[in-house]
Amino acid sequence: MKIFKPKFWHKKNSLISFFLLPLSIFFQFFLVLKKKLKKRNNFFIPIICVGNIYVGGTGKTPLCIELVNLLRKSNKKIAIIKKFYKAHNDEVKLIESKKIKLFKDSSRVLAIKAAEKDNFDCAILDDGFQDSSIIKNLDIICFNEKQLAGNEMTLPSGPLREPLSSLKNSQIIVINGNVNKIFEKKIKNISNNVSIYYSQYLPTNLNEFANHKLLAFAGIGNPNNFFKLLEDNNLQVVKKISFPDHYNYSKKELDDLINFSIKNNLKIITTEKDFYRIEHCKIPQIKYLSIKLKILNQDKFEKEIIKCLF
């Protein structure tokens, strides 16, 4: 079954959001209570948390990968920590494909302890801003410039796991996309001490798809962001097909994509995450767009990270 994010999550003053408000209040009450009841764990190694408050599609995993690359330049032994969900195996394969040590467990605490035991210098949490059981040295929150905070309401009235006010508990905000001074001002009104950086996705294999008409499909948090990235890089996208985040493709769906592409003389392109989700199917017709995350003002970003940790 395909379940997409509802459109009212990005509409101000939606009646549906208003009617769901009691559930949102209950959800936040439960979240606060859960945080207060959890035992807090300290660790011998510094912990960076790369999280979000907007549910899905903010670029946490690419930022984690880039952080590993930056910290390795300081000759540090870095691991990524991920709470393991079977449905998120695509992200696991993506991280491991970059030759990065990943510790995954149903408990983030146990995964961090395993990294400590193996003498890693630092652990990066891929998600976990809402996990109060871990005392972190640095909280980085990701946003995508195209969605930002939606209607700024919490689940299920809106797309936020926590209200914007929770940003006061973070030190760095990374916005993927174009500069948005209005949103920056909103963040600074919540916490004037938070640092704001921007990032961009840089495709590294565009030549593979240039001069081809493309069928693009994606099962990520925000598929339209992927399609826009293709078009912004002057690729000819003829057909776009969206699937929900971490979607489990059936053989029939993949066969339909291939048959449509053959019939219409199209080359198939997808995201790297989607590719690793269907890698076991061994379909040579499906290729992925390889991307690198670039942090703008990277030197300042890198210095701030290292200052917070070591």
Regions found by a protein language model. Name each.
Residues 2-47, 309:
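A transmembrane-helix-recognition feature enriched in membrane-embedded lipid enzymes
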Residues 209-251:
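Redox- and metal-dependent alpha/beta enzyme cores, enriched for Fe-S-associated oxidoreductases
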